């Protein structure tokens, strides 16, 4: 390659943020480093666009698709491209989406191309484009490009440390207090660097445009949002923007958790959970703390209640009125429900709660009793609300639920008006179902306050994903044995048949199969110093971390294999694919191509669809194991 080609390639990779570079002061050359995270995020392009389409509408999806294709883009360049597109669309609406550089053609995949042609371009004007960008910036899905964007987290940490040492500790660090101060100043510098990408969002918040829209609009009505275009300030045309993949991962995690809740609790309860997650993660910028930049984070920022809390009224205000909250709620007699246990408040996450309980055991016995009295006094407010609503609560479920059996009898004499008045109580029932689930979807952290502890929820989801893989690989017996080992810990090989209720030959064969797959391990413990094999204990155990790590590596290998097979198919059918790129053939392949060529092209499309579907399934697994 010529130097010009190398420079051009580096520029393109930097524009898509696929490369990091760092230049030391006074140095003549820059050092480059690959950005594997953003390179992998290209696989999630379809999921991100689908998420944007569902949450913000088709115009926002079109803007995000433009940024995905063009990379880091100046606002003026994006506006100029859409101006030309809008003019072409107004002149010839019938050809909108066929010959554009930003991929609007993807919006006609679902068979609604006729509707798109009648409606014209998705972006109606530059003011409409400005509004969409502002909304995406406020949602942190788009952030600002600054000089530190092109540096890796390790280089940023080294730069901040060097600046702090030169400015505040020129004579060196001496003593414990100085070390603590050094860590605090480094953390402050890292937070300052991270906050530079949110400068545009802060300007919009100071302008108050978001608050005005929240008062006027009941959600992100992107398709009908032209009436509020004048409320947003005009963006600086010199501003360079890009997609914030970290925030996209937060929204993708919410969608995955809602899907998980749907499988465990039902659609209505999962919808309530989705609204709770949306409110809770509104100001959450990333799924996981960065190992370098957040390693010396401010301890004062850590909230005892986790990522924050949401009240019942806030959830109720954001629920659609068309959703029937009576669906998915069981019925029981008033005396069969322990309101004290159901309304239990957990102020702290599971790990912190254990430490507090251990500290209380060391004290007097009355301390636990006093705590129980305090909790019961706090729960008395819940009890009063709960009892008041139970007069209508047994009637809050429509006749479609719980009617399969003949032994249970319900009082269905409540009027529809009374059922509508019971909507807050029905919402509380869904939230309590999520809080009482074994998956720890929700934690009841205060009076009418709810939060989500993502660590135990994601641990449960990873365990469910691992169980699914074990069942497909080793069958139900293998999954049963793994769950026994998780519950019992390490078990002797001689005791395992009695616990598992299986014959020893069958058990040994199944354990060997799972050991080969990496789901279980065995440990040899000698009885004496001679370490005789015949006199040793063989303990079987299940190491979750090792199994998940091996499963993640298998996912990487599978994804790479699928992409390699796809590349081989493209080379094999190169002549057919080159024919389909011709302007006189594109869109009319069946009519213009020979039968043999068209059959080869159809087989290639089918194979490509299956391979991409497999890649997406593997990406779902990788997201749960690594990113979420």
UniProtKB/Swiss-Prot annotation:
Highest rank taxon of the organism: Eukaryota
Sequence ranges of Acidic residues compositional bias: 360-383
Organism: Chaetomium globosum (strain ATCC 6205 / CBS 148.51 / DSM 1962 / NBRC 6347 / NRRL 1970) (Soil fungus)
Family: Belongs to the RNA polymerase beta chain family.
Main location, first listed in the record: nucleus
Function: DNA-dependent RNA polymerase catalyzes the transcription of DNA into RNA using the four ribonucleoside triphosphates as substrates. Specific core component of RNA polymerase III which synthesizes small RNAs, such as 5S rRNA and tRNAs.
InterPro entries noted in UniProt: POLR3C_WHD, RNA_pol_III_Rpc82_C, RPC3, WH-like_DNA-bd_sf
UniProt name for this protein: DNA-directed RNA polymerase III subunit RPC3
Region spans: Disordered: 360-422
């Amino acid at each position: 390659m010529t130097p010009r080609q190398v420079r051009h390639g580096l520029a393109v990779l930097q524009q898509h943020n696929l490369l990091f570079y760092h230049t030391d002061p006074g140095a003549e050359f820059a050092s480059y480093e690959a950005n594997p995270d953003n390179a992998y995020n290209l696989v999630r392009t379809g999921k991100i666009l689908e998420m944007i389409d569902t949450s913000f509408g088709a115009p926002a999806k079109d803007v995000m698709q433009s940024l995905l294709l063009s990379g880091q883009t100046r606002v003026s360049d994006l506006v100029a491209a859409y101006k030309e597109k809008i003019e072409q669309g107004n002149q010839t609406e019938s050809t909108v989406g066929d010959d554009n550089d930003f991929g609007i053609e993807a919006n006609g995949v679902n068979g609604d191309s006729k509707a798109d042609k009648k409606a014209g371009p998705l972006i109606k004007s530059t003011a409409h484009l400005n509004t969409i960008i502002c909304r995406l910036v406020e949602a942190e899905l788009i952030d600002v490009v600054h000089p530190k964007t092109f540096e890796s987290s390790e280089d940023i940490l080294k730069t901040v440390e060097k600046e702090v040492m030169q400015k505040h500790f020129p004579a060196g660090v001496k003593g414990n207090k100085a070390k603590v101060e050094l860590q605090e100043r480094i953390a402050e510098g890292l937070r300052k660097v991270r906050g530079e990408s949110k400068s545009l969002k802060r300007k919009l918040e100071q302008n108050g445009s978001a608050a005005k829209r929240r008062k006027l609009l009941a959600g992100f009505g992107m398709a009908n949002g032209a009436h509020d275009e004048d409320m947003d300030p005009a963006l600086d045309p010199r501003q360079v923007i890009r997609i914030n993949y970290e925030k996209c991962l937060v929204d993708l995690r919410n969608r995955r958790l809602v899907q998980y809740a749907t499988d465990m609790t039902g659609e209505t309860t999962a919808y309530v959970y989705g609204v709770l997650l949306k409110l809770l993660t509104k100001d959450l910028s990333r799924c996981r703390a960065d190992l370098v930049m957040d390693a010396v984070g401010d301890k004062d920022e850590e909230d005892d209640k986790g990522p924050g809390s949401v009240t019942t009224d806030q959830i109720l205000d954001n629920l659609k009125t068309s959703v029937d909250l009576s669906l998915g709620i069981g019925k029981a007699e008033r005396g069969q429900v322990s309101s004290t246990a159901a309304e239990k408040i957990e102020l702290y996450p599971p790990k912190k709660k254990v430490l507090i309980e251990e500290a209380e055991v060391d004290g007097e016995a009355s301390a636990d009793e006093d705590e129980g009295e305090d909790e019961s006094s706090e729960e008395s407010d819940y009890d009063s609300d709960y009892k008041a609503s139970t007069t209508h609560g047994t009637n809050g479920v429509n006749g479609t639920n719980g009617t399969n059996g003949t032994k249970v009898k319900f009082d269905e004499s409540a009027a529809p008006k009374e059922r509508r008045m019971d909507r807050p109580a029905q919402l509380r029932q869904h939230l309590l179902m999520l809080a009482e689930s074994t998956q720890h979807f929700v934690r009841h952290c205060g009076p009418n306050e709810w939060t989500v502890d993502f660590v135990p929820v994601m641990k449960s989801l990873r365990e469910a994903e691992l169980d699914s893989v074990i069942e497909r690989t080793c069958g139900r017996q293998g999954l049963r044995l793994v769950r026994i080992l998780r519950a019992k810990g390490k078990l002797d090989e001689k005791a395992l048949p009695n616990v598992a209720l299986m014959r020893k030959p069958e058990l040994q064969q199944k354990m060997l199969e799972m050991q080969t797959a990496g789901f279980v391990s065995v440990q040899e413990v000698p009885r004496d110093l001679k370490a005789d094999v015949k006199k040793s204990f063989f303990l079987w155990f299940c190491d979750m971390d090792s199994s998940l790590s091996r499963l993640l590596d298998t996912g990487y290998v599978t994804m790479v294999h699928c992409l390699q097979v796809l590349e081989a198919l493209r080379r094999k059918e190169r002549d057919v694919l080159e024919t389909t790129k011709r302007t006189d053939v594109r869109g009319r392949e069946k009519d213009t191509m020979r039968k043999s060529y068209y059959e080869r092209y159809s087989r290639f499309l089918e194979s490509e669809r299956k391979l991409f579907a497999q890649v997406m399934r593997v990406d779902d697994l990788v997201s749960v194991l690594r990113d979420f």
